[in-house]
């Protein structure tokens, strides 16, 4: 960490969090993980290793459905790991899918593959004894899970725009470059998981494994990056610490990016020092300075981000402490150039184009709706087998979207009928409402240790109830962006939904309304600590008014604000917790 101290960063006078000690003592993230792998007395990791495995893309979890039962039997919780792959832009080849499918079936407790809204896949329920084989498998097919969790730059998102294929490819290449550029330089991941060799700390190692961008204590907190291609904001570009909005020149070629910082959706119930936030614009950079801008933002966060209080350690709090102008000036100093004025752009939609679309290169792309991103086999819907069968014949690639769906991309005209037949056979093509198409949930119970309420397991029935409400008021063909998360950690971006549910306790949620369709506005708390049925009743009343009082093409989230049902969140750090403090201004 830098020795720099500037006005407004009072945290620098306070003790560092223990995570900073942990990273310093970790021998560049190796810890004693190899020793723990040999310990068969527990299914989990001890001491610092419990946290260190996160830097390698894993979390220790257990099955909370049977936790009490095992406690009665005097057994430790049934521990296992979540593995999150690094997959910039969400592109994966069919041969890679075949291998990850095989591992999921043979070695995970839940025999499923979970698509995430960060455009990658997760395994749930991997036993400790299968971790090294899993990482070696990923390595053998050109994948890894480096830096998909913990205090690093996580999986980089990129708009899944199959129509503008050339522009998408250009932006995707930059998403990959950004991901690679911001990776840790340490060989700790390979030493532990692939080579399985113990490396002792030494002065020579310190010289070899210098971390010129991240530093030896890495970043103060998680760091998320996205690349968006207007007019589609499928990646929720305002929700990330660092964001790049692709700008085209007069010939339709990528010429640079608008750079935004300070987005993030996590907060803590009742803690008014925490808040969700939409990102602020720093300005425009031409293509040749893109990596310098990314590095400059990361270095600024590295040096000035809060390392004392992890609840205030994300980039948005650093921007608040330094001021936006102060943050911009430090980034410009790091990259040795000035930002140009922000270039004009417009986002008009956020969801995926479900079904077939044709690209400008005449290839076809089939977007499959995957509810909550869960790919598994059920008697009525053998989705996992269906995707496997597609992988066996598909000649293009798969793209995981930021809405947890799957695109069968680059299908030739002559292969289209075969792809569609397989997808229909296994229930991968289905008739769904617009409401369901635009709904998301986090995993939550039974595996997430932070979950306060259900999410994925209640979403299907909850959306069915809301579908009835929309039909009742003759707006069944309309879309309301609805998201459920089991806690306020923000994993499924409920704080950018028109209707956002945030878990408060088992069976109870806080209801937020008033986000917009473009993903520019934070929804405000409307009702606190109520049941799902009470939420349905509240939405019934709101939709009744929306259906009869709205203006032409007025979205639900815009209506509840125009009608003064709820006040907008204008400056989240000022008015998220108290609408009486609103100071009218622009959001970005």
From Swiss-Prot:
Alphabetized NCBIfam families for the sequence: CysI (TIGR02041), PRK13504.1 (NF010029)
PROSITE patterns recorded: NIR_SIR
Protein EC: 1.8.1.2
Chain residues that bind siroheme: 491
InterPro entries the record matches: CysI (IPR011786), NiRdtase/SiRdtase_haem-b_fer (IPR005117), Nit/Sulf_reduc_fer-like_dom_sf (IPR036136), NO2/SO3_Rdtase_4Fe4S_dom (IPR006067), NO2/SO3_Rdtase_4Fe4S_prot (IPR045169), NO2/SO3_Rdtase_4Fe4S_sf (IPR045854), NO2/SO3_Rdtase_FeS/sirohaem_BS (IPR006066)
GO cellular component labels: sulfite reductase complex (NADPH)
Name by which UniProt lists this protein: Sulfite reductase [NADPH] hemoprotein beta-component
UniProt keyword terms in alphabetical order: 4Fe-4S, Amino-acid biosynthesis, Cysteine biosynthesis, Heme, Iron, Iron-sulfur, Metal-binding, NADP, Oxidoreductase
Keyword Heme applies: yes
Gene3D superfamilies from the UniProt entry: 3.90.480.20, Sulfite Reductase Hemoprotein, domain 1
